[in-house]
A protein has these predicted regions:
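Alpha-helical transmembrane segments of multi-pass membrane proteins
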Residues: 1-152, 160-168, 176-181, 203-211, ...
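Hydrophobic alpha-helical membrane-association signature
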Residues: 194, 295, 299, 330, ...
Length: 420
């Protein structure tokens, strides 16, 4: 109970410094998890073997007692996982969940002390330990939370980037990732490379201001807001987390009448939709967390079915320039469905082992131009990689075609830099 209550302190005091100090997100998340949860997990596992030995000692049919212990452990693990994922974390947050577990341990400690007829000294030591739990819990509950809002999916934060005297510019942070930046007075200006390309490239392909679009992922809603400001209508956004949309409305100047928002998994929403769209945009991908069901051969086939004639599919992707395994796999998979697949990125040589932002354009035909200039937020040039170079990457990496049965894209994107 003390270790679990103490984990709340560790989470709130060390999460910020660890995530800011350790650059690679996988290493940072692993370090934070080990620091906060190693001791609670260790102590939670101690009673089970002790109780198992006590349960079978002196019994003629010890296998029944041992089986009951294992069954109780399995039921508890399943129930705990379900309650944490679908009840406690979504409704109360991670800190309140840990405090609830600490309280449960405390009640169990009192019951065990009573059933075991603890001596006064033992009961006093138990009471002192539980007093420590109470103090730790009260202190943790009063500490400044790391998240502005903790949903079922993300720790959501808003960071103001502009000075107080200038029009506000804000950054949305989902977990550790800077997901989107928006300016109140400049809705058409994109502040990141991936939103700049997702904004400009489909408009370049459409060659008109009136077209329909389906957006996979909302985030700060930078692109839907920019297109609505340009008078583009027929915008549909599939954002799985309602709290993200609420935060976009609250802090990022997104208005509900700018787009039709569907709070569902994007693949399900697209499958259920009977509409055909001129543009489909995939913006649900981060640097280490990838919804694998949105990068498979089967999903890209669904995208192709939902595209109107002459339509285009654009999706962002982050990969390490030292390997480009993930980029090659997605490009190879898209080529199985679409006649034309282009890979766009900033028009500059890559840095060694740089985690580079790419946007893949897929459709029935190639783009009319091989380079564009747009604001991100200053003028920046983006260009399509030569087709021969993309062929070489796919051949060199022996690119895997991703399917619903096997799509290890998170491994290709996130683990290679750590292992290497």
């Amino acid at each position: 109970a003390c270790a679990t209550a103490g984990a709340t302190f560790l989470l709130r005091t060390t999460a910020g410094p660890i995530l800011q100090t350790i650059q690679h997100p996988l290493v940072a998340i692993s370090a934070l998890s080990a620091l906060a949860f190693f001791l609670p997990s260790l102590f939670a596992g101690v009673p089970a073997p002790v109780l198992a030995v006590a349960a079978i000692r002196g019994r003629a049919q010890s296998e029944q007692a041992l089986g009951a212990m294992y069954a109780a452990g399995a039921v508890g693990a399943i129930a705990g996982t379900l309650l944490a994922g679908f009840l406690f974390v979504p409704w109360f947050g991670s800190v309140a969940t840990l405090l609830t577990i600490a309280a449960t341990y405390s009640v169990a400690a009192f019951i065990c002390s009573w059933l075991g007829r603890a001596s006064k000294t033992e009961f006093l030591s138990t009471s002192l330990g539980l007093a420590a739990v109470l103090l730790l819990s009260a202190g943790a509950a009063n500490m400044q939370p790391v998240c502005d809002r903790e949903s079922s999916y993300y720790c959501i934060r808003t960071v103001t980037l502009s000075e107080s005297q200038t029009p506000p510019i804000r950054l949305m942070v989902l977990d550790h990732l800077a997901h989107g930046i928006s300016g109140r007075d400049t809705p058409r200006v994109m502040f990141t490379d991936h939103t700049a390309m997702l904004d400009a490239l489909p408009r370049m392909r459409m060659r008109r201001d009136e077209f329909t679009s389906f957006h996979i992922g909302g985030g700060s809603y930078s692109v839907p807001r920019a297109w609505a400001d340009r008078g583009i209508s027929g915008i549909t956004v599939a954002e799985i987390d309602p709290e993200v949309t609420s935060k976009a409305e609250e802090d990022f100047w997104f208005e509900p009448d700018m787009a039709t928002v569907v709070h569902r998994d994007a693949r399900v929403a697209l499958w259920e939709s009977e509409a055909r769209y001129d543009v489909i945009i995939g913006d649900a991908f981060t640097d280490i967390a990838v919804p694998e069901h949105l990068v498979t051969l089967e999903f890209f086939g669904l995208v192709s079915e939902r595209l109107a004639p002459g339509g285009v599919f654009a999706m962002n992707l982050i990969d390490n320039t030292g390997s480009l395994d993930a980029l090659a796999a997605v490009a190879a998979t898209l080529r199985e469905i679409f006649p034309s697949v282009e890979v766009w990125t900033e028009a500059r040589p890559p840095e060694p082992n740089e985690r580079r932002v790419f946007v893949l354009l897929a459709g029935a035909e190639d783009s009319p131009v091989s380079a564009i200039e747009t604001k991100a937020p200053g003028e920046k040039r983006f260009q399509a990689l030569d087709t021969g170079y993309v062929d070489e990457i796919i051949e060199k990496t022996d690119a895997l075609v991703l399917t619903d049965d096997h799509a290890p894209l998170s491994h290709l994107m996130g683990f290679n830099p750590v292992i290497d």
